[in-house]
Curated annotation (Swiss-Prot):
In-chain residues carrying the UniProt-annotated modification Phosphothreonine: T303
Gene: gln1
EC number per UniProt: 6.3.1.2
Catalyses which reaction(s): L-glutamate + NH4(+) + ATP = L-glutamine + ADP + phosphate + H(+)
The protein's enzyme class: ligase
Name the record gives this protein: Glutamine synthetase
Keywords: ATP-binding, Cytoplasm, Ligase, Nucleotide-binding, Phosphoprotein
Source organism (scientific name): Schizosaccharomyces pombe (strain 972 / ATCC 24843) (Fission yeast)
Amino acid sequence: MSQYDVEPLLSKAAILNKYADLPQNGKVMAEYIWIDGFNHLRSKTMTLDAKPSSIDQLRVWNFDGSSTGQAPGNNSDTLLKPVAMYNDPFRRGDNILVLAACYTADGSPNGFNHRDACAKLLEKHADKETWFGIEQEYTMLDYYDRPFGWPKGGFPGPQGPFYCGVGTGRVFARDIVEAHYKACLYAGINISGINAEVMPSQWEYQVGPCAGIEMGDQLWMSRFLLHRIAEDFGVKISFHPKPILGDWNGAGCHTNVSTKDTRAEGGIKAIESYLEKFAKRHKEHIAVYGDDNDLRLTGRHETGSIDKFTYGVADRGASVRIPRSVAMNGCGYFEDRRPASSIDPYLVTGIITETMFEH
């Protein structure tokens, strides 16, 4: 039997609802979520006697790191340290979602834990009052890894009608997008908007503004919610920066940045000084801005070239865009358009902070 003989097994929501409202006899379900060795997410659940009032009341747990690409089989126990807590939109009630960071037995960060170093760097420069906002683009795929809603054996019409589209044939799977929006709000994610993207079956949502380490924490949790909701519809979520080769837009994680200085009167000068530093460290940034980003940063489809740093006002073909409103007001924020949709936000917010304040 090939994979093409298998149909996706959809969630049976109506049946599940018979059990979802059963009383839990005072117990609380806490789902621990972590980043694995493949830039994806894993989770497992434990039962608590009561809802914790702070993250410090949650215990350190562990998992088999050899099964997630994070540890060898002869020393596989990897520690899960809770770092952020959210309302659970799936189980509701007092149940919670717990974002956890991975550590080795000696207490040092696991090799795939980029949060630890990022948190220290952001805390070091907390006086700069840096705010981040990330635009997460993603592509919906069907069970056979074909963009969801695309014609079988063919392609949709050229790009044009799909960006912020309305109507059948112009947008696909809006119900997943709406469900994710509501779930993020319920969970406590600072989701600030959604829109259909240029390529059909591609969407975007925005998280932020967030200060400090919350940017990375909230983006990862929002991705978890998206994957879980898509499960119910038998749809896969791809964060690949160029899921379909050819004359189609790629997917990015445009990262918006402002500091106390850029938001102040005359802050455009601070923005320009930061971008001069960015130009000198372009290669270092590209190195952590996502795998396969060379397929996306071609200078076409609203991207700059991966080989050259540029910036400009209202220029979506530049590495960094200064919004028209910022140029007119003389202060505000800038948008780094280089990060791919698959980024680890801890690496991206970390290197941006490092470049602005330590170079």
